[in-house]
Swiss-Prot record:
GO terms for cellular component: mitotic spindle midzone; proteasome complex; proteasome regulatory particle, lid subcomplex; proteasome storage granule. Residues 16-152 form the MPN domain. Coiled coil: none annotated. This is 26S proteasome regulatory subunit rpn-8. Acts as a regulatory subunit of the 26S proteasome which is involved in the ATP-dependent degradation of ubiquitinated proteins.
Amino acid sequence: MPATTAETLSLVNRSVSVAPLVLLSVVDHYNRTQANKSKSKRVVGVLLGQNDGKNVRVSNSFAVPFEEDDKDPSVWFLDHNYVESMNDMFKKVNAREKLIGWYHSGPKLRASDLDINELFKRYTPNPLLVIVDVQPKETGVPTDAYFAVDEIKDDGTTTSKTFVHTPSIIEAEEAEEIGVEHLLRDIRDVAVGTLSTRITNQMRSLQGLHHRLRDIQAYLQKVLDGQLPVNHAILGNLQDVFNLLPNLSTPKSGPGATGTNADSELNHAMSIKTNDQLMAIYLSSLIRAITAFHDLIENKIQNRQQQEENDAKKKEGENGEKKEGADKKEGSPAAANGESKEKENSPKEKKK
């Protein structure tokens, strides 16, 4: 039965969250497979979790033996008996985790994905496909989630199967978050300030936005050239995104005002705001430098005072040793005189 627009929108609006354990398992599966092969081939596995119709939680996964022909995409092999036996064993361990879909290492959709997806419909009505980019070239979420739907064409021809993209996030459970925080606590660089962290995050966000805009531009260009059919659902979503953009044009000051004069107020306001932000950054840097100089001077003064105290103690010790030596020298002649007197008296006693 062809999927209606409402059903397609319900699939697109589903919240898909992937646990970090799944990403670790997929990467480990890929590395173990590539170690025994000369060519890099994609790997396929099964996703386990919960799907309540609105939220999809992918919490676990397991690998599946899979082979395909590089020259003919329609020739592939997936051991469904292995899938059934592993699924039964996972049910005994955790009955809450059910088979909700499958994954492969992509990094893009393949021609045989629709046929593989039909195979997984034996186990779940609407399987979820998650493509995990095991070798990402850009920063961002390394997962892409898809649901298969029947696309209704405008010319009245027969429907065709296609995948619709749904947003996905990486979300860890509380125990996983505690473990990650414990590991990162020892390797986190405390010297990195909050400002640099914010700037790095904003730069990564802008890079991801630029990548998405390039994808949108390439898609619209292909639709314009006739390489792809017109999809009203995608165009409607793009129009909603464009409608959210702020109106940066200012009203004209008079009937004879030109566009340049009309936008001068906006440019002036943006310049003032930018200058204020740069002034705040400059003042904060200046205050931080002055504080560092103050701490340096305080450390110098403390080191000098401590050095003077050590020198004074050292001089006192040397003076004390000199006095003791002088006292010993003064006492030794008196003792010698006493001994000589005793020797003089001793012969007299003998004579008596």
